Every structure is written in structure tokens, then in C-alpha cells.
Amino acid sequence: MMRLIIAAAGFALLTAAAHQDVALKALMPKGMVIGVAINQRQFEGADVAAVDMITTQFNQISPENVLKFQPTQPAADRYAFDAADRYVQFGLDHHMQVVGHNLVWHSQTGAWVFQGADGKPADRDTLLARMRDHIRTVVGRYKGKIHGWDVVNEAIDEDGSLRKSPWQVGIGDDYVAKAFEFAHEADLDAELYYNDFNLEKPAKRAGVIKLVQDLQARKLRIDGIGNQAHWRLDTPPIDDIDKALVELHATGLKVMFTELDINLLPNTPRGADPSVANPYANGLPDEVQQQLARRYADVFRVFLKHRDAVTRVTFWGLSDADSWLNRGRMNYPLLWDRERRPKPAFDAVVEALRNAR
């Protein structure tokens, strides 16, 4: 029996090693990069194992938080670039495509940005000046180093209208256009993107398409649309993902899946029964592991079917342990488990990529 246990353990180690010898980036079609959002411990090198995985598996990185408005400009008269500098340098040192996320968003932006000197809401001219200063300072600092920027994030509401964010209220509907204008002025060579979620929903997708067409009509640079791709096992249906991709690409822009993960937990109210809210606290059942693998295989087949349109796929986190979707529960949305071992979902993605070659 002991020999069987030792043999099984040895087989498991060999299998894991074989998996880790497979690099996703080596299997991607020409013109399509594969990336991951990384956190500060990772790009600063404190998590050595993570650094090895990131640089082995991926050829693109996005920052979880360090390039957002609040971390880079915590006060009107103060910028803070230490962490952002290290993130960018990590990508350059490892010859990876570096993406900047994000410049203008209604969240993670200091309240001071939207306040006037009298404590009332800032007027249009004040807000435009602050936006221009921020974008020119941040984008200008990394000119020639950051490949592309999520210029505006989540500006469209679920009904397809422009979200009534502090930016929209203070500046007007043209705040998005102004952000793209300022970003291009700061780095003429950087790619510029619009990024949002739920683009499989027709009304929201129509609003995004209308927005980017307005930017195009103004002759402003916009290179791509980022579909965040925070999905679930059964939703959105694969046909809806396919249809959304086709319609977004019909704008003439690149399509990118920028924050990919697959949420396995139910939406439950605060205080819900733990057995309902956190059903996989003791591990993920094999049946659900296989469902996750099939889901990842299906979505990657769509990406590969439209390889003429899709230029990037980025996972939002390296492993289940790193995912923002845990939130005090046990979620399993990515390709590697909490011990950073490849899951059946990893094998499914590898197979889909190999079959498409």
C-alpha cells in the first residue's frame, strides 16, 4: 500500500511538472497575447513562485490597482509613483506587453477631484483641468513604456445610457472624448482602449458601440474595446459571447478580453446561510471542476474562432488564491488552484489552443 501511495504521489508531481512545462503564451495564435493582472507582492518580487509562473505562462500584464487615479494622485498637489514604477519596470525587465489600467473611472478616485474650492461640486473647467493634468502626468511618465491604456472604464450604464458619474455630471457627455484626447496628446504612440463589463447584454453593448462611434466621428484615437469578461458557469450563453464579439469588432476596433474569470459562487444577500453563500468551503467537487473546464474550453474556442478580431486575453488574477472574487468566501474562478497547481480548466485551455494551431 505504501508503495502505491508513493507511486501515486510521484505521478502527481510528474503530472504537475508536465503541466507547468506547458506555456500558454507559446500556444497563442500570432497577434494574440495572453496576460494576467498582477498585484504588488508579485511585481515587487516578494512572491517568487508567482513571478516564475507569470513570466513563464504570460506575455502581457495588467495592474490590479497601482495605476488607478487614487493610488497615483492621492491629493491635488501630490503624485505617488513608486509602486507604479515597479510594476512598469517588472514588465519591461521581462519583455512583456505592459497595459495601464485605468485613467478615468467613477471609482477609486479621490473625493477631492470632484470638489470645488468652496466645497461645492467642481465646475466643468476645474474638472477638465484636473483630468488633463492627471492624464498628461501619468501617461507622460510612462511614454514609450506602456503599450496601451484603459483610458475610460465603465462609463455606460446597463440600459446603454451614459452613466451619471461625477465625471459626467461635472463635465458633460463629452468627458469621455476629452479623456481620449488628453491621453493621445500625452503619448502619440500608445494604444487607447475603452473598457467595460456585461457587453453581452444588447442594450449595454449598443451604448458602448454608440460611444466608440462618437469617438471615431470626432477623429479621436481609439484602438480597442475591452470586454472585462467577468462571467459565470452558465451565463452569459456562449452564443451571446460570440455575437457580442462580432458586433464589437464591426466597429473596426480590436476586441480584448481584459479581466477574465468565471465566478462559481451564487449571488447571496449579506448574512445568508453559509452553506448557500459559500458552498465550496471545503473544496471544489470534481463535477464542478469539469464544468469549469468545459466553460473555459468553450470561451477559448470563441476567442480562437475570431482570432482576426481578438488581440488579447487577460486573466484577472494568477490563481484562485489571488482572485478578487473570494471576498471572504472560497471561489475557484481561475486556471490554477490555491496551491497554484494547474486545474482541469488549465488543461482544457491548453487543448483548445493546441487544436486551433
Feature map (PLM): residue ranges:
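Bacterial Sec-dependent signal peptides at the C-terminal "C-region" and cleavage site
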Residues: A9-V22
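Acidic-and-aromatic substrate-binding clefts and catalytic sites of carbohydrate-active enzymes
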Residues: A37-V48, F69-D82, I156-S161, L199-G207, ...
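Boundary/entry segment of secreted carbohydrate-active catalytic domains
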Residues: H19-Q60, E64
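Aromatic-rich peripheral "rim/lid" segments of glycoside hydrolase catalytic domains that contact
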Residues: L24-A26, A111, K120, T137, ...
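Hydrophobic faces of well-ordered beta-strands that scaffold small-molecule active sites
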Residues: I34-I38, N59-P63, V98-N102, H147, ...
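Substrate-binding cleft/loops of secretory-pathway carbohydrate-active enzymes
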Residues: N198-R221, A321-L325
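Short, acidic/polar
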Residues: R41-T55, A129-V138, K204-L215, Y296-V302
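Substrate-binding cleft and catalytic face of glycoside hydrolase catalytic domains
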Residues: D21-L24, T56, Q60-P74, A83-E200, ...
